[in-house]
């Protein structure tokens, strides 16, 4: 169930989140980078070039709902190096609240751009799949690694849709 106080606090907390080293805003309690597709691609490419980790999240309504009850999942979004709006409802809400988030940045579209980057960076970019429906990450890993593109899947994990605590007690 939603915590109304938390949701209202997230709505009222419109200020820039100053504890990040980038232009991040709070949207219903989650950090969202104020970037479009071009800047998101630039940041990922810069991380690849500099050989830095770039853990990015693609919040949508499902993320917002999951983050209300799953602390571990919420913390993973907060710890992301890049958090882009993957859902139009989030973009509309940001606009309504006056946040400078102007466009949807679908993770799948960002992924497709990076698939063609092998020549640009001189090697395949290592990716790790996390989450999704049962078996989807494994299948995506196999398909990606059998293709001739700029990405290689180095692993995947699908912990299911329960909380970390629930899965640990099984």
Report the location of each language-model feature.
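N-terminal nucleotide/polyanion-binding subdomain common to many enzyme families
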Residues: 7-109
């Amino acid at each position: 169930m939603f915590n109304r106080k938390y949701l209202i606090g997230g709505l009222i907390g419109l200020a820039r989140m100053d504890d990040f080293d980038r232009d991040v805003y709070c949207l219903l309690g989650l950090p969202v980078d104020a970037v479009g597709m071009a800047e998101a691609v630039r940041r990922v490419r810069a991380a690849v070039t500099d050989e830095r980790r770039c853990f990015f999240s693609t919040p949508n309504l499902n993320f917002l709902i999951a983050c209300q009850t799953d602390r571990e999942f919420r913390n993973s979004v907060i710890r992301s190096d890049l958090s882009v709006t993957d859902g139009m409802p989030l973009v509309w809400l940001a606009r309504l609240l006056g946040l400078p988030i102007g466009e949807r940045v679908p993770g799948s579209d960002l992924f497709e751009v990076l698939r063609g980057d092998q020549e640009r960076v001189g090697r395949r970019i290592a990716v790790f799949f996390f989450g999704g429906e049962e078996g989807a990450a494994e299948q995506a890993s196999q398909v990606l690694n059998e293709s001739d593109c700029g990405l290689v899947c180095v692993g995947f994990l699908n912990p299911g849709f329960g909380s970390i605590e629930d899965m640990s007690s099984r």
